[in-house]
């Protein structure tokens, strides 16, 4: 919902008209696109997939630490508010940032956020962790939209589809299964693992910055 609100405030990827003759459909076009963008896709899959433990088990973990259901709801709401604010101010805040720089910022926020959640359940730190949702999720999504919008022609639509299916869907689904196994055996240690999952994104960022 918060991502939808942010996108309504300002669409990140504007549609571009082109003739049917320019479109190249078929498997070769998709294969070429993935070959050119695999670093980007791997990076965003790690950053978005690292949210799996948070989405699936943070409420259970916090309630087990003594927080009421309403307190957990407020913490989740704080993350949503931070997300919407950054979406609304993104043009002003990140005007000079390319996709590569935004992905670095998101990765740093990811390591910090999941590390905090694995380290403590003290309320002040959980508030910080929830505010960092604007970095782990929103900044990553903004970087993806900036990278995708720099593509040419029908590649924009194709890469948007791959990003939505793989990074926003598949990676989170797979990591949720993995996180469930880890939470059963490691408890809060699953968040440390998520911090480690986000870390390689620093090196996997696409080499060419897309503005």
Report each predicted region and the residues it spans.
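A membrane-interface helix-boundary motif in multi-pass transporters
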Residues: 1, 178-198
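C-terminal membrane-cytosol helix-exit motif in multi-pass small-molecule transporters
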Residues: 1-17, 201-209
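Juxtamembrane intracellular "pre-TM" segments in multi-pass secondary transporters
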Residues: 10-46
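Helix-loop boundary and gating motifs at the non-cytosolic
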Residues: 36-75, 141
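Helix-to-loop junctions at the C-terminal end of transmembrane segments
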Residues: 85-99, 183
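Structural signature of the two symmetry-related core transmembrane helices
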Residues: 101-116
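Intracellular juxtamembrane helix-capping segments at the cytosolic ends
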Residues: 138-152
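A late C-terminal transmembrane helix in Major Facilitator Superfamily
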Residues: 157-185
